[in-house]
């Protein structure tokens, strides 16, 4: 049996944040190549355009700032327009600020928590009703080793990724009864 048969995502609609580079772009590339319709979200539109031009499969891009909590419901609605209601959400967007705890500013703390914790939660919350209506959904939140191991120069990032781990467990408790894991 070929990998394409084992990993066939035809008929699935995926929203992937942080898709302009790194792990998010890798996930978007693989899911599109295996048949999912992919909505790639990131801040850098030029990088999204470059990725989309080379991606195999059906893709759409959405340039958006996920750190703006007030825009997240609108971003989720916009992500649902190209292909319909998503049933896969991969939260790969994130920021890793590295500075000693004494040097962390309010703005740096807020940016890290908004992008790494609030964005995944509020995007999921906005997309879950559609997943629930379909009776199936998958939400993948990227965490980090720093969620379990403290680093002197990574307090805001480590705290955010610890929160992502716990949030993911709570999401599973809340939504698995609806087929959303």
State where each predicted segment sits.
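Conserved glycine-rich cofactor-binding loop
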Residues: 13, 20-22
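Active-site helix of classical SDR
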Residues: 124, 160, 168
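Alpha-helical segment proximal to the catalytic Tyr-Lys
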Residues: 129, 173-174
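Substrate-binding pocket helix/loop in short-chain dehydrogenase/reductase
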Residues: 100-101, 105-110, 139
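Conserved glycine-rich Rossmann-like NAD(P)H-binding loop of the short-chain dehydrogenase/reductase
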Residues: 34-50
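The beta1-alpha1 cofactor-binding region of Rossmann-like NAD(H)/NADP(H)-dependent oxidoreductases
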Residues: 63-74, 106
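Residue(s) in the substrate-gating loop at a strand-loop-helix junction
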Residues: 144
